[in-house]
């Protein structure tokens, strides 16, 4: 059984929103990167294709924001990553829970002609043209 986390008094932190095609994960950290609270669409109770919806992302953000509020977080810097549909709804839900958003940053990694993609990805890219 995991031990209960101590209540921390942290006024500001970073909210990381990772939104993929299948799931949305929200993590609240302090400025150093230590995790304070986290939640995901799957943790909240959504299964299968329902995890990728924006409603599931907002419910996960509500759960994570509630835990972060208990640790004293009042303002965050939001870093969003990924191409999923739940990024904006998760950010809005964080604001609804009374946590002030000071900065919004998109940190989605974009390759600048890196390694060659697998054959199936190349086929998909050719079909789109």
From Swiss-Prot:
UniProt feature, compositional bias: Basic residues: 117-129
Chain segments carrying region Disordered: 108-129
Keyword RNA-binding annotated: yes
GO biological process entries: translation
GO cellular component: ribonucleoprotein complex; ribosome
Source taxon at top rank: Bacteria
GO MF term set: rRNA binding; structural constituent of ribosome
UniProt xrefs under InterPro entries: Ribosomal_uS11 (IPR001971), Ribosomal_uS11_bac-type (IPR019981), Ribosomal_uS11_CS (IPR018102), Ribosomal_uS11_sf (IPR036967)
Keywords, sorted A to Z: Ribonucleoprotein, Ribosomal protein, RNA-binding, rRNA-binding
PANTHER family registered for this protein in UniProt: 40S RIBOSOMAL PROTEIN S14/30S RIBOSOMAL PROTEIN S11 (PTHR11759)
Quaternary organization: Part of the 30S ribosomal subunit. Interacts with proteins S7 and S18. Binds to IF-3.
Family: Belongs to the universal ribosomal protein uS11 family.
NCBIfam families: PRK05309.1 (NF003698), uS11_bact (TIGR03632)
Known function: Located on the platform of the 30S subunit, it bridges several disparate RNA helices of the 16S rRNA. Forms part of the Shine-Dalgarno cleft in the 70S ribosome.
Protein name per its UniProtKB record: Small ribosomal subunit protein uS11
Lineage: Bacteria, Bacillati, Mycoplasmatota, Mycoplasmoidales, Metamycoplasmataceae
Gene giving rise to this polypeptide: rpsK
């Amino acid at each position: 059984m995991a031990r209960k986390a101590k209540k921390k008094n942290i006024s500001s932190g970073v909210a990381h929103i990772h939104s993929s095609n299948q799931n949305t994960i929200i993590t609240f950290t302090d400025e150093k990167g230590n995790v304070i609270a986290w939640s995901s669409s799957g943790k909240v109770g959504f299964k299968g294709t329902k995890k990728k919806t924006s409603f599931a992302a907002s419910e996960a953000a509500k759960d994570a924001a509630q835990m972060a509020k208990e640790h004293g977080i009042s303002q965050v810097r939001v870093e969003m990553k990924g191409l999923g549909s739940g990024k904006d709804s998760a950010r809005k839900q964080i604001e609804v829970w009374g946590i002030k958003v000071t900065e919004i940053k998109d940190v989605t990694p974009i390759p600048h002609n890196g390694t060659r993609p697998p054959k199936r990805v190349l086929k998909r890219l050719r079909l789109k043209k």
